[in-house]
Amino acid sequence: MKSHLTLLSILIAGFAHAQDLTPLSDLMKTAWPKNRAIQVVFHGHSVPAGFHKTPEVKTFESYPHLVHVKLKEQYPLAIINVITTAIGGENSIPGAARFERDVLSLKPDIIFIDYALNDRRQPDEKVEAAWLAMITAAKNTKVPVVLLTPTGDSSAKLDDPKDPLNLRAELIRKIAKDQGVLIADVFAVWKAEIEKGTPQTEILSQVNHPNLKGHTLAAETIFKALVEAGLKK
């Protein structure tokens, strides 16, 4: 009986409503002397790390910085530290292994996770387990998490549902829904931009890294997701 109740509680928790960012919004509205530094952490691979055309890193033309600018425009009283714990070439499996040491140790107020591009060559079950491990660890410390679907890749067949990039995007959407965490569906916006007639070469700096225009698309998608979750003026 106890095992059935445990399973039921897991299922109920899994289908919880997405996290509400109203408390974080209130924190960002707090003025001196009652305010404090707010830690915003971006975890993932080379894209949030700021790589454009490898090995060049353009921190100020990459979505973590662009989101930082948008946050400061909306919350002029807030002290906001944007920290990138991303590592170029990494996938979610080693990313999960270092999550507590490199991410939770920073005492973040919100965490963004972006690994789909590099997860394509990893086994499905290990990828899902890694994402779930990071989400669970964040939930245990009551930190809101935002999952990111990928930016594009010129080698991917974006119109093929069975393309590995589409499959990874679908997995992330499923995990976000099941776990009741936030999602910024960058991949959906990216594909919509392509469908409007924009060549991928105009939003990529190389085969798998966005340029400023591509990072701007990602940042706008992320910020919209935050606003919809309660991050409002």
Model-predicted segments: where are they?
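Catalytic His-Asp segment of secreted/periplasmic serine-dependent ester chemistry enzymes
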Residues: 151-233
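Active-site segments of SGNH/GDSL-like serine hydrolases
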Residues: 114-118, 134-169
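Positively charged n-region of N-terminal signal peptides that target proteins for export
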Residues: 1-4
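Extracytoplasmic/secreted envelope proteins and their assembly/folding machinery
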Residues: 25, 64, 68, 96, ...
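Serine-esterase "nucleophile elbow" of acetyl-processing enzymes
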Residues: 19-85, 98-107, 198
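Internal alpha/beta domain cores that form substrate/cofactor-binding pockets in large enzymes
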Residues: 39-41, 72, 78-106, 118-148
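Hydrophobic h-region of N-terminal signal peptides that target proteins for export
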Residues: 10-18
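Cell-envelope and extracellular/periplasmic
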Residues: 47, 55, 84-90, 112-121, ...
